[in-house]
């Protein structure tokens, strides 16, 4: 008879990066279900880890929240870089990225609240700066293509995401309309394409 593995023994066999990934995934699920006030022992249980394991990886809940935000920002940075290199062209790649990020935001209740909580965290600031630089490169490429208005900046993207986030509170799917309007506003002047 083969002995059953306990969650603790499975945890012990994981690499450090797998442990971190499992904790972040569990934290995202628990925070989405229970809110940011969810206790660390609940997150540990969801990950199949002991509470001490959580605190070894993340000394405080603030550090755990920051790691979640950094993970999402890194995904956005990677998306912006991939979009800039896309064969679809900078404008199409930019709008595709905006749709993907807005949909993630609309379905990820934790991200906005966590970002507001840990926006001043040093790791979040570094990741935000890298993401902003990647978005600036994508905007420059779309601007050079002639499809993005000349005065568009990453601040405009932040405003657009704030508006789409607010629209999720109004009505199901309202964020889509807000994003459509925002993308139209970002486009360079074209006949018949003015708001």
Which functions belong to the PLM regions below?
Residues 1-7, 133, 137-145, 163, ...:
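C-terminal peripheral helix-coil segments that are non-catalytic and often amphipathic
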Residues 19, 72, 76, 90, ...:
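Hydrophobic/aromatic residues within well-ordered alpha-helical segments
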Residues 35-36, 56, 149:
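Helix-turn-helix/winged-helix DNA-binding modules
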Residues 48-58:
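Short hydrophobic/aromatic patch on the recognition helix
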Residues 67, 74, 78-106, 120-123:
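Hydrophobic alpha-helical connector segments
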Residues 87-115, 144-150, 169-173:
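Helical hydrophobic small-molecule/effector-binding pocket
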């Amino acid at each position: 008879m083969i002995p059953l593995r306990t969650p603790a023994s499975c945890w012990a066999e994981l690499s450090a990066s797998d442990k971190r990934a499992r904790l972040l995934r569990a934290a995202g699920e628990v925070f989405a279900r229970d809110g940011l006030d969810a206790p660390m022992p609940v997150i540990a249980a969801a990950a199949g880890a002991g509470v001490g394991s959580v605190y070894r990886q993340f000394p405080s809940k603030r550090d755990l929240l920051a790691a979640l935000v950094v993970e999402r920002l890194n995904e956005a940075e990677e998306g912006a870089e991939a979009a800039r290199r896309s064969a679809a062209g900078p404008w199409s790649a930019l709008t595709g990225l905006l749709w993907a990020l807005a949909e993630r935001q609309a379905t990820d209740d934790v991200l906005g609240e966590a970002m507001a909580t840990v926006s001043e965290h040093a790791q979040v600031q570094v990741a935000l700066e890298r993401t902003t630089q990647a978005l600036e490169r994508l905007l420059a490429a779309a601007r050079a293509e002639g499809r993005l208005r000349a005065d568009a900046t990453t601040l405009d993207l932040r405003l657009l995401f704030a508006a789409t986030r607010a629209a999720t509170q109004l009505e199901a799917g309202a964020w889509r309309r807000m994003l459509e309007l925002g993308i139209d506003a970002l486009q360079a002047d074209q006949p018949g394409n003015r708001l």
